[in-house]
Amino acid sequence: MRILMIVGDYNEDLEVRFPQQAMEMLGHEFHSVSPGKPAGSSVVTAVHDLSDTSLQTYTEARGHAFPVTHDFDSIDATTYDALVVPGGRAPEYHRCDDRILDVVRHFFESSKPVACTCHGIQILAAAGVLPGRTVTAVPFCRPEVEMAGANWVDRGLDGIEVDGVLVTASTWMSNAPWMRAFSEILNGAAV
C-alpha cells in the first residue's frame, strides 16, 4: 500500500519517525511531503516531554531532521491508500493551508484509512471532517475537537480511539497501539 504523511517543521519527532518505520517494516511504500519543502530536503522535528507533572504544559526541545521524500505540489492524493497526520507544532500552521485541508478531505471523502495523533487533530478539525466522529487527542485539543462537532474521549496520554477507518491517538506514548490498529485496518481486519 502507498501511505502518505504530511510533515512540517516541529512535528513531534516520535510521531513522524515511528509511523514511517512501522509502515516500512510492514512493507508499505511510505511518502512524506511538506508544503514549501522539496523532495530530498528535511523538516526539523521537536521532542516533547509530558513527564514533569509539576508543569502546566509540556517541554519542547529541537529534535532530529526528518526527510521529505516527495514534492507536495506534485503528489496526487488519489494514488495513495492511507494518510498519517502527526502532531507536534506543525499542525498549528498546517491547519491554515487550504492545500493540506483538501488532501485530508480527499481521504475522508474516499473512506480511506487515516491515522492521526496528538495535535494533528487540529488539521482534521480545520478540514471539517470530524462532525459525528468519536476521537481522542492530547487533552489540550479537546475544545477544538468538540467545536468541530466530534465526540472527544479521554484515553489518557497513551490511548487510542478507532472510529471506522480513522485511528486517533493521544500522544507519542500511544504509538504502538496506534500503529497496530492502523495496520489492522490497512490489512482489512476488524479492530
Predicted regions located by residue number:
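Short, thiol/selenol-centered motifs that function as redox-active sites or metal-ligating centers
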Residues: 116-120
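Extended, subdomain-level signal for the structured scaffold at the beginning of enzyme domains
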Residues: 1-110, 123-134, 142-191
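Active-site-adjacent substrate-recognition loops and nearby beta-strands
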Residues: 138
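ADP-ribose/adenylate-binding Rossmann-like module
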Residues: 111-115
